[in-house]
Amino acid sequence: MRKTSTIIFRLLLWGLLAALPQVAFPQLDAKTLMQAQRNGINNPLYGNNPYENGEDEENLPPNPADTAKEKRIRKPLESYFFNDSIRALNNFLWTISRDYNRVKIEPLDTTLQDWRIDYPFYRKGVGDIALGPLGQASMPTDYFERPRYENFSFSQAYDAYTYNLENVPFYNVKKPYLQMTYLESGQKKFREEQFGLTVAHNISPSTGFNINYKARGTRGQYDRSRTKNHNLEVAFSHTGKRYSIHAAYINNHIEQEENGGVVGEWAIVDTTFEMPSGVPMRLASAEAENIFRNNAFFVEQSYGIPLLPVTESDFSIAHLPAVYIGHTFEYNSWSKIYSDIRSTYVDDRGSRDENGNFVPTEHSFYKNWYINPLQSRDSIYERIISNRFFVQAQPWNRNGVVGTLNGGVGLDLHTYSQFAMDTYLTGEYRKTKKTGFYVYGSIDGKIRRYVDWGADFRLYPSGYRSGDLSVGANLALSAKVKGHPLILEGRFRMERRSPSFWDENLFSNHFVWFTPLSKETDTRFEVTFRVPDYALEVGAKQGVVTDKIYYGADALITQAPGAVSLTSVYARKDFRIGGLHLDHRVLLQWSSDQEVIPVPLASAFLSYYYEFWVVRNVLRLQIGADCRYNTNYYSPGYNPALSAFYNQREVRTGNYPYTDLFVTGKWKRMRIFLKYQHINKGLWGNGEYFSTARYPLNPGMFKIGLSWGFYD
């Protein structure tokens, strides 16, 4: 009897073991499974081991098969957001759309490309109009790349540094991911420092969390140029087969001492100081400072309802007709405190006498002192609470001719706080509340691999910003010639938008206005042609702005009647001859009214370097130089009390090649760089190294950086 039971038990056990492979891979046929196992992949739907492939990792031999024990196979990533090529990546990140149930895949920052560019505002296009030191305000040189904040426009100048609801990254990693970065430069007394930490971990293939923290700042080469920026982002995501959720908390803290720029260009061009801190600044004795605080939280959820039965062979519902319903909640608050004390500065070359000799002149930086004639402490606050409900229809499949039809409604609750004349003495804030209601929608699709198209709109039918409208469309055509992809893209966007609250209402010690403004209309056309395999990109943009709102020559809010047109042509071509890289980015811009939209005629970023293996698959180096340049024009000025750029008409800047010499390397997972910034100071150029009027860029200094990634 005992022998019979033993035989039956063994037969049942063998049958169970024989059935295990079929249970583990219900979606794979035998041929696919054998090919995957031959390539050392335990589960091809979950991707490769990050240590087995790629330049970034060690090429370790696969582990020998364990015939004694079968490994438990994890459920693969089944989200409709990601296609097979994305799932196969070892690590990837994405951002989520605030309005639509869509994600955008972004590259991980683990390569040598652009690693040497330590200022974040220099990483795109031809660069930015910047005050100089790390952590201070900047604005893209390319007019079409400049952000326009509808809410709390005072933080717009720090867009390159801050986390916001549009750029929060979410990660999917096969192994726990940790990356640490540290960069420093200059003497201890004037040091610039950057520290970055990224931690990402997946609890399951579909569920993960990540933390990003950045601390950037400088003690300042020039007097009163200390900055301190802290940016924290904590995010959680679950991208399941039907249900997905993205949630994140953001904290941005910015402190910037304000020096007002040099008393005169002569202090940089014609005078040599023993230390940069000796250069006379216009607000050096005013103790001026800006402090920004931002707290934000959002959660976006969606649930997919397939319209056809889901079988075991359906890896995701991306290829099935489906309807998705979702909701987005946002909380976002910003505050700004500007403080200073009344003081004057002396320009030793302010004027000339009848004999042509310089005569010192005394000036006051601010013309008006409305509240307190001795000191300022301007405090403003803005909060927005937003709810969106959306529906997304997927008629056939997510990448079909009509991929998705989207529609939604949103409700925004705005609160604005600032002092008023009748409440300033009591210390009470005056609060203004507004409610905005809007509807929006879009449609997009794909015709095989050759055509991508889409259109969208947003309309405010009532409430705050009533009548605002945004309409856009895009079309991308793809083809291959001898195996090389060619991409032609066209975009159109028309926006009719109300002025922001602060454009019409501001009460502070130096600026007061309560002026209703008309809606601004901005129409743009864009065409781009790209050949990725040959590192070639050319494009043209045309814009027409009617009733443009801007800060005029006196830094007061201004609205230009009529239309202003702006045309730009952009070209990028990277040449490679063996290990020699010759990278070029050139931008040409024409404005019909330079007093309203001032832009340089030509701007360029050139990078020439040689890249080679020191030790094959172990250590790779780049040695070269970067140069930024723009033609002479009336560059924007910067006003500390507003934290905004304005269209000054007194000083022209440009015609200066700002050049850096660098050596970067990657040793396995560690990246390093050595750089001498502004190596041409005093050697070539006209000596006018200004990007913003009266704000000199940093003088020459040595930098060193280290970034180390851990994937286990």
Question: What does each model-identified segment do?
Answer:
Residues 173-175, 284-347, 351-712:
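Exposed, low-structure sequence patches enriched in small/polar residues
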Residues 27-295, 304-318, 478-486, 694-699, ...:
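Membrane-proximal, glycine/serine-rich, low-complexity loop/turn segments characteristic
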